[in-house]
């Protein structure tokens, strides 16, 4: 397994729409494993393949405290959503920035697991929010897109400054 490079805004590759996975095979499973390795190394709770410049409909999530409840979503589809909630969200592609984003409180999805087996999942709370956040990435949408243009500009400037400082270090 290896840690992949996470794209940061304003990289336009984050805006690409991911294509469906045609076949879950050893290559896709390796991508899933590398994505988990990357997510854990970056201390995230979710990662979409788009964020690591792989434009296929793959998501990995682990919202557990012990980091031992891996969830793989290949070709996820949103079947139902209900209620309203929101928390301050962060994103590995928008480092050190957080903002309140409106989300559905509960979701029901259909996806394939790491072995290509179909399943359905009902989720609420943090898991539901994380699923929606990561599914947004698959269509080129970022949490900051829900914010006002002024807030988006401030976030872009802060991230660009942070990336410049890291490049000098």
Curated annotation (Swiss-Prot):
Presence of the UniProt keyword Ubl conjugation in the record: no
Cofactor binding mode and count: Upon overproduction is isolated with 1 Fe(2+) ion per monomer, a Ni(2+)-bound form is as active while a Zn(2+)-bound form is inactive.
Entry annotation: catalytic residues: 134
CDD domains: Pep_deformylase (cd00487)
Enzyme Commission number: 3.5.1.88
Catalytic activity: N-terminal N-formyl-L-methionyl-[peptide] + H2O = N-terminal L-methionyl-[peptide] + formate
Keyword terms: Hydrolase, Iron, Metal-binding, Protein biosynthesis, Zinc
GO annotation (BP), single: translation
Positions in coiled-coil regions: none
Cofactor: Fe(2+); Zn(2+)
GO molecular function annotations of the record: ferrous iron binding; hydrolase activity; peptide deformylase activity; ribosome binding; zinc ion binding
GO cellular component: cytosol
Regulation: Inhibited by 1,10-phenanthroline.
Function per UniProt: Removes the formyl group from the N-terminal Met of newly synthesized proteins. Requires at least a dipeptide for an efficient rate of reaction. N-terminal L-methionine is a prerequisite for activity but the enzyme has broad specificity at other positions.
Family from the record: Belongs to the polypeptide deformylase family.
HAMAP family, per database record: Pep_deformylase
UniProt cross-references to NCBIfam families, sorted A to Z: pept_deformyl, PRK00150.1-3
Subunit and partners: Monomer.
Protein name: Peptide deformylase
Gene name in the database record: def
């Amino acid at each position: 397994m290896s840690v992949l490079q996470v794209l940061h805004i304003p990289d336009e590759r984050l805006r690409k729409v991911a294509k469906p996975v045609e076949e879950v095979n050893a290559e896709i499973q390796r991508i899933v494993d590398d994505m988990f390795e990357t997510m854990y190394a970056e201390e995230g709770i979710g990662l979409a393949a788009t964020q690591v410049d792989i434009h296929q409909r793959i998501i990995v999530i682990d919202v557990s405290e012990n980091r031992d409840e891996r969830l793989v979503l290949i070709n996820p589809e949103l079947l139902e959503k209900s209620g309203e909630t929101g928390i301050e969200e962060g994103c590995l592609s928008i480092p050190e920035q957080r903002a309140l984003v409106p989300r559905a409180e509960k979701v029901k999805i259909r996806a394939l697991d790491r072995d290509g087996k179909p399943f359905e999942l009902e989720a609420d709370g943090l898991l539901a929010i994380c699923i929606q956040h990561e599914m947004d990435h698959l269509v080129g949408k970022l949490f900051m897109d829900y914010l006002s243009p002024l807030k988006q500009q401030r976030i872009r400037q802060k991230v660009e400054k942070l990336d410049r400082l890291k490049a000098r270090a």
